[in-house]
Amino acid sequence: MIFLFRALKPLLVLALLTVVFVLGGCSNASVLDPKGPVAEQQSDLILLSIGFMLFIVGVVFVLFTIILVKYRDRKGKDNGSYNPKIHGNTFLEVVWTVIPILIVIALSVPTVQTIYSLEKAPEATKDKEPLVVHATSVDWKWVFSYPEQDIETVNYLNIPVDRPILFKISSADSMASLWIPQLGGQKYAMAGMLMDQYLQADEVGTYQGRNANFTGEHFADQEFDVNAVTEKDFNSWVKKTQNEAPKLTKEKYDQLMLPENVDELTFSSTHLKYVDHGQDAEYAMEARKRLGYQAVSPHSKTDPFENVKENEFKKSDDTEE
């Protein structure tokens, strides 16, 4: 047993460290706490894959232990029949080639099925008209446009429950990634491109969304709240916003193109009448030039905002280095 423990010690240490690191990153494992049909499908796929792979690892460890114990060198063992000249075993070679292929197929089939099924509205609510929301990433903020309601929000999102949401995802500058873990997986946002993604919330609540792709200095602050409310409350919010929120002018939208953090904002019109970031990949850069912003190396001592007038949307607690 001592010999067995010594032989397995490196593997046990590696397994323990793996568990520690994995669990250390799961203090808020919201991916495994789905609140919508899309996230639930993806969570089921993740758990299926983990279970399948754990089974394979278990089989490998059992076989490893059996071989280690059965064929270990020990006193009184007759090694006379041992023949070091091994010419191969066709049957075994076929087996350990076919098994990995079958494993890959077994994992690929449900994965491909899930990926294709998520390209359309959830089955349970496919007959409902989806709410269209344009999600635009700008360093370091998210802009959400409701074209049918003529509303635009910054760094927060209101959606009705039990209704599919069709996101039209794009970026004004850096390549980003829209991710609301409890509602579904991430999808990339790229300048000059428009990506579609269906998500849905089944429960009233507030869920956290974020940028899942590194975009520079304040990448970690590019988060937003998703407020899932009843259809009635959503309609009330729409009506109130249309009547009370200020209009979004082109000049104000240009200010949002500056690479800064801003607070939550609400407008009773959208930027879609000024620019379609899915077609125009240069708008943000041109807007920054109009405002006097000068892009410089991160190692430069030059202040890129030196010629920029104070941005009325900028967070008051931001500090520039």
UniProtKB/Swiss-Prot annotation:
Signal peptide positions on this chain: 1-25
Location in the cell: Cell membrane
Lipid positions (S-diacylglycerol cysteine): 26
Pfam families, per the entry: COX2, COX2_TM
Transmembrane segments: 49-69, 90-110
InterPro entries assigned to the protein according to its UniProt record, in alphabetical order: CcO_II, CcO_II-like_C, Cupredoxin, CuRO_UO_II, Cyt_c_oxidase_su2_TM_dom, Cyt_c_oxidase_su2_TM_sf, Cyt_o_ubiquinol_oxidase_su2, QoxA
Gene3D superfamilies cross-referenced by the UniProt entry: 1.10.287.90, Cupredoxins - blue copper proteins
Catalyzed reactions: 2 a quinol + O2 = 2 a quinone + 2 H2O
BP term (GO), one: ATP synthesis coupled electron transport
Any GO molecular function: cytochrome bo3 ubiquinol oxidase activity
Uppermost EC category: oxidoreductase
Bilayer topology: Multi-pass membrane protein
Main subcellular location of this protein, as a coarse class: membrane
NCBIfam families associated with the record: QOXA (TIGR01432)
Primary role: Catalyzes quinol oxidation with the concomitant reduction of oxygen to water. Major component for energy conversion during vegetative growth. Subunit II transfers the electrons from a quinol to the binuclear center of the catalytic subunit I.
Name the record gives this protein: Quinol oxidase subunit 2
Organism listed in the record: Bacillus spizizenii (strain ATCC 23059 / NRRL B-14472 / W23) (Bacillus subtilis subsp. spizizenii)
